[in-house]
């Protein structure tokens, strides 16, 4: 502690705030020992000494008024006087304390003290952090300063470096509320003309609700000209809540913004669009929804935020979403990057609107299939199995009709889909229709065999044995089917299944015996497993 105290004045405010936070909890733990009158651990005096050294460090660092101001305005580990006496001094009380002090700081800023307080602002703004919990109090402080003392805020901006200008939205928000329209317009015009702080201006527009459409269009125009993707996204978001089919903002802002982002193949906007939800995406026209989908094609994978957007669009425009996945499947086949995923292995809500129209779902994927397409099982077929994981009856009926009455291409299409399932009972009507359709020597019957034998993950030494026995039991009903081809296929399949069961049984027993010999006893095997 003496080492830290001696060198405290040489350390950054960021480090001092963190050290004080850590030492606060050491102090609280030590106090329990120091106040133990029975001295159960025999170190009460040592604990008291440690408390005194921590207090010495605390008092020294807090003697620096600039540090106290800094930790009040910046950070989330800041420690204040009530923390040392009251362990119940919670987050809500801390925030109240900080906001009250920030108000006092604003009151203390006079023309004579501007230089001193600008240095405080400059030091706070120089803090490097990507944690959103670092600057809320500081941002509110700047907003309140600009609102109550617009002249001071304007002069601060006149000398601001890049770090301070990172907080330009807070200044603009305050100036907008200050009632000093002339100063507000002058600042806004200056930074808009400079074209270097378009993101900040757009974020300010998101905060205020009284910005003219001409101002928004001007920022968008400059952002596009400067190839500032983030600024374009922020301009779109700034008035997204006011965009509906009757609003000119859709054509004037959303359409040029999304078309620009499509051209840039930049879909980062999805990570900030979650808050738009039902107020924006479901009310888009078909043409506008397709623009959103065009932009999403460039995403390397469909994650949570993108799926939420697709759910909103799939309700009114399911055909467009199926077409979107068709484009992603084509992109996957052409894309050299292995990281590109056309669709996730499991949906978390999108399957519901997509499964509402079975005919549309199957027809959309069928339109992508051509004879001899060996990849169907791994893309389009898997997409359908992801949307219909339980193989519902309407889905089964449509596939059965295709298997029985469709073309040879339809048969290949159905086979590619079924290989994504595990021979569940729900798939059997379709498989029977295929068996009845195909001749006994048709090589495609091997794909029916594969569909029936798929098991997924099994467990235990005799996992495959048990899985195949269950499949054999389910297949017994096929032997009573009125269709001769189905009966004959079932008898032959069960015969091969018996051979497979016997083979798996022998293999499992041999491996078990070999382990016994290698590890001497079952007890040793159990110990190794446990």
What do the PLM-derived regions correspond to, one by one?
Residues 1-530:
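Non-catalytic all-alpha helical scaffold/repeat segments
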